[in-house]
Amino acid sequence: MNNIRKNHPLMKIMNNSFIDLPAPSNISSWWNFGSLLGACLALQIITGLFLAMHYTADTTTAFSSVAHICRDVNYGWIIRYLHANGASMFFLCLFIHIGRGLYYGSFTLTETWNIGIILLFTVMATAFMGYVLPWGQMSFWGATVITNLLSAIPYIGSNLVEWIWGGFSVDKATLTRFFAFHFILPFIIAALVLVHLLFLHETGSNNPLGTSSDSDKIPFHPYYTIKDLLGLLLLILLTMMLVLFSPDLLGDPDNYTPANPLSTPPHIKPEWYFLFAYAILRSIPNKLGGVLALILSILILAIIPILHTAKQRSMLFRPLSQCLFWTLTADLFILTWIGGQPVEYPFIAIGQAASILYFTLILILMPTVSLIENKMLKW
């Protein structure tokens, strides 16, 4: 058995990635979220596949096909809610995973970090298109508002929007292509995950100290397989509590009304995991400026390795940077709250202040404080 595991061409890859992989001996539970994201992706692909067997991508029957899944298909309700709430768990793990990378300086592994940013954009695109598929009010108007943002692009904007819509409004053609993309993208994500892991295993994992752990490595199995299993059980517990007790907690009641192009919902808003970016978009009165701010709010992650001015990799022993990190976290919570509020006083002002703080923290305050901490090392 030992020989098969180490010599068989396929088994050897698995062995070197998940069994005999040398891992740092001191990585904490914050490193669990990578494997949890893998579990979330597997859950989404499996539940999505079963939903696709019963779903029809047509404007006249899409809404009723989702209702049919919940009412008539064996365990259809649990498959649907696992898929919807599984997306929320996916993003929760994703945000913590990115936060961990920022806190402990994992962004210094630039190839892994950049593939991660591409993954984030791909997952966000997939989730957005998935939200359109039930063809409820928020699905339709969310699709209309977000795709319409592309019309802010000079010269080609309006043509681009009509090209994406496949007509002069969000209609049957849009729904069909969104379903096609929503089906294929998770498999592209799975391929990107393998590239992400490939680059990670080239350098080895970071650790809480941010130091080299080459002198002290332990095998991934059994130590971290058991540790990841505990994290997985807790994730399953949280997901099942959500699915079985309050499946619609994170959804929007408007999406239980079939899409109606003649009636606009009072407050158009995306799912909770996009609210922070939506708040940044809304905080700028100019359309093109808002779109640029929206894209930059995510793309800013790509320049974080360049903005890293500290002599220490991790924030573990940098209390001033820690204060700024948790301020950034609080700021993102505020932006998420603002994104779900109507566009009126005082929410507009709070959103603008939180948006300015978000960019100021990342671009100016964090690099400056890191330089101050470098000076403090000499005291």
UniProtKB/Swiss-Prot annotation:
Its main location: mitochondrion. One of its GO terms (molecular function) is metal ion binding. GO terms for cellular component: mitochondrial inner membrane; respiratory chain complex III. It is a multi-pass membrane protein. Heme b b566 binds at residues 97, 196. A ubiquinone binds at residue 201. It is found in: Mitochondrion inner membrane. Binds 2 heme b groups non-covalently. It comes from the Eukaryota. Keywords: Electron transport, Heme, Iron, Membrane, Metal-binding, Mitochondrion, Mitochondrion inner membrane, Respiratory chain, Transmembrane, Transmembrane helix, Transport, Ubiquinone. InterPro entries: Cyt_b/b6_C, Cyt_b/b6_C_sf, Cyt_b/b6_N, Cytb/b6-like_sf, Cytochrome_b, Cytochrome_b_C_euk/bac, Cytochrome_b_N_euk/bac, Di-haem_cyt_TM. Heme b b562 binds at residues 83, 182. The chain crosses the membrane at residues 33-53, 77-98, 113-133, 178-198, 226-246, 288-308, 320-340, 347-367. One of its GO terms (biological process) is mitochondrial electron transport, ubiquinol to cytochrome c. PROSITE patterns: CYTB_CTER, CYTB_NTER. Its cofactor is heme b. Heme 1 (or BL or b562) is low-potential and absorbs at about 562 nm, and heme 2 (or BH or b566) is high-potential and absorbs at about 566 nm. Belongs to the cytochrome b family. The cytochrome bc1 complex contains 11 subunits: 3 respiratory subunits (MT-CYB, CYC1 and UQCRFS1), 2 core proteins (UQCRC1 and UQCRC2) and 6 low-molecular weight proteins (UQCRH/QCR6, UQCRB/QCR7, UQCRQ/QCR8, UQCR10/QCR9, UQCR11/QCR10 and a cleavage product of UQCRFS1). This cytochrome bc1 complex then forms a dimer. Component of the ubiquinol-cytochrome c reductase complex (complex III or cytochrome b-c1 complex) that is part of the mitochondrial respiratory chain. The b-c1 complex mediates electron transfer from ubiquinol to cytochrome c. Contributes to the generation of a proton gradient across the mitochondrial membrane that is then used for ATP synthesis. This is Cytochrome b. It comes from Eulemur fulvus collaris. The lineage of its organism: Eukaryota, Metazoa, Chordata, Craniata, Vertebrata. The gene is MT-CYB.
